Regions:
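Charged catalytic carboxylate motif
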Residues: 4, 8, 36, 94, ...
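N-terminal beta1-alpha1 ligand-phosphate binding loop
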Residues: 1-19
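Short amphipathic alpha-helical/adjacent loop interface patches that line ligand
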Residues: 9, 13, 58, 141
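Generic secondary-structure signature for well-ordered alpha-helical cores
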Residues: 17-21, 67, 100, 104, ...
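A short beta-strand-loop structural module common to alpha/beta enzyme folds
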Residues: 19-33
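Glycine-rich phosphate/pyrophosphate-binding loop and the adjoining helix
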Residues: 33, 107-153
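Helix-loop-strand module that forms the ligand-binding subsite of alpha/beta enzymes
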Residues: 29-114
Length: 153
């Protein structure tokens, strides 16, 4: 809605896309389904923090795909990105718990970017993610892709 998470996801996808032999799909949670989960070798889950948790659309994605992928994607790599207004830890923890149920393996600690948006105006304002934060997301995407390409993950 305000663009912060999308900027983070695009940066991670750009980093991953530079690895030879790795195909990257950048999908919105509302558009992604069980087949997308099943055909991927790794996952970067990006969500805004909404009311101290992951977004409703991300929760809907997990609700729609969880059982279709259960016991079929064990051991695959994942990473969590959170664009938060104040904290983001609960959103990251929610995703980590779902990923643990899928028996996914984290490649890094969740990356939580805090925008410090605390008023309704700040929360609803379009976000401009700083270059250093986008670079960190790009680096994490590259790490994911490199690890997959080398068979580490």
């Amino acid at each position: 809605m305000t663009g912060g998470t999308l900027q983070m996801a695009r940066a991670a996808a750009a980093g991953a896309g530079g690895e030879a032999g790795v195909a990257v799909s950048l999908l919105r949670a509302a558009e992604a389904g069980a087949e997308d989960v099943l055909k991927a070798d790794g996952y970067i889950f990006a969500t805004p923090e909404n009311l101290a948790g992951m977004s409703g659309m991300m929760k809907d994605f997990f609700d729609r795909t969880y059982y279709a992928a259960f016991e079929r994607i064990n051991g695959r790599a994942f990473l969590t990105l959170v664009c938060a207004g104040s904290d983001g830890r609960n959103a990251a923890q929610q995703i980590d718990r779902i990923a643990a149920g899928w028996r996914l393996k984290p490649i890094a600690d969740p990356y939580i970017l805090c925008t410090h948006a605390q008023t309704p105006e700040q929360i609803l304002q379009p976000k401009m993610i700083e270059a250093a934060s986008r670079a960190r997301c790009e680096e994490l995407g590259k790490t994911m892709a490199s690890g997959l390409a080398m068979g580490i993950f």
